Amino acid sequence: MTELKNDRYLRALLRQPVDVTPVWMMRQAGRYLPEYKATRAQAGDFMSLCKNAELACEVTLQPLRRFPLDAAILFSDILTIPDAMGLGLYFETGEGPRFTSPIKSKADIDKLPIPDPEGELGYVMNAVRTIRRELKGEVPLIGFSGSPWTLATYMVEGGSSKAFTVIKKMMYAEPMALHALLDKLAKSVTLYLNAQIKAGAQSVMIFDTWGGVLTGRDYQQFSLYYMHKIIDGLLRENEGRRVPVTLFTKGGGQWLEAMAATGCDALGLDWTTDIADARRRVGDTVALQGNMDPSMLYAQPARIEEEVASILAGFGQGEGHVFNLGHGIHQDVPPEHAGAFVEAVHRHSAQYHL
């Protein structure tokens, strides 16, 4: 494997010294870039784009050609696992992801296979290998998965949800059925992330997009417990270096201490959490990633720069910060505003690493 030319993202996750704060953006390969839209049109639809290693590689690299980002993230979707389990993923225009065969009973759960990462999910591993090759050691590659709870919400609700009543009904009326589903998903995610690491991912991230809809007690039992299980089962070293793990629960700022206790290397923060407060609470055990409001990218570059400076000052001197948005970049953000954001992070952060 090629020597890594820029490893500041990996170093920051391990709270090691860096020259400037590393930065990348969730959904950095996406619809705000005209070149992404062109490649997606060439692929035909979203899943065809994910399943074509060359095109998935192309869209992964597109933002790196425009901006001096410190990491690439695999272009894929969190719903690849439920799709590989046979639920029939499709995308409804304006509706988001849907499943033709959502989970309705314990019998449905019992029938679910644990997908083979090099079988049904082999297209993801092919994309990882292709991207690693084409990155030529410029920056590290991040692999990822949805969390068991977040995947379960889509599988039981049949798609996106606003109130999560269907899965909460299962959680409160048939908790053992939901635990059986989450257990199967935890095993699947562990295999999936380990396969991504073996294929070349140099860091992995678990996206718990919907953990924040739970009570504190339910979060511990139905989300965090299974993420902890996954972390315990992950390969933490590959190619002679540590493979850092980042845990991100959107809306989970009140549970940072419990999240840090899982043994992950870093926690993702959404924009509702104060980064200075987060660092006081858990900064001696984990790195922090975040956490500008993605909507700030609608502002003029001077205002974006102000916000970047304010978040950097909030984190303060020293190591253990990866700058990012608090969630994915919006699809109608002007690309030059994203560029102003990335450059502002590098320009304003050097003073914190003297």
Curated annotation (Swiss-Prot):
Pfam families: URO-D. One of its GO terms (biological process) is protoporphyrinogen IX biosynthetic process from glutamate. The record marks 77 as: Transition state stabilizer. Its EC number is 4.1.1.37. It is found in: Cytoplasm. GO terms for cellular component: cytosol. GO terms for molecular function: uroporphyrinogen decarboxylase activity. It catalyses: uroporphyrinogen III + 4 H(+) = coproporphyrinogen III + 4 CO2. Keywords: Cytoplasm, Decarboxylase, Lyase, Porphyrin biosynthesis. Substrate binds at residues 27-31, 77, 154, 209, 327. Signal peptide: none annotated. It is an enzyme of class 4 (lyase). InterPro entries: UROD/MetE-like_sf (IPR038071), Uroporphyrinogen_deCO2ase_HemE (IPR006361), Uroporphyrinogen_deCOase (IPR000257). Pathway: Porphyrin-containing compound metabolism; protoporphyrin-IX biosynthesis; coproporphyrinogen-III from 5-aminolevulinate: step 4/4. Catalyzes the decarboxylation of four acetate groups of uroporphyrinogen-III to yield coproporphyrinogen-III. NCBIfam families: hemE. Belongs to the uroporphyrinogen decarboxylase family. Homodimer. This is Uroporphyrinogen decarboxylase. It comes from Enterobacter sp. (strain 638). The lineage of its organism: Bacteria, Pseudomonadati, Pseudomonadota, Gammaproteobacteria, Enterobacterales.
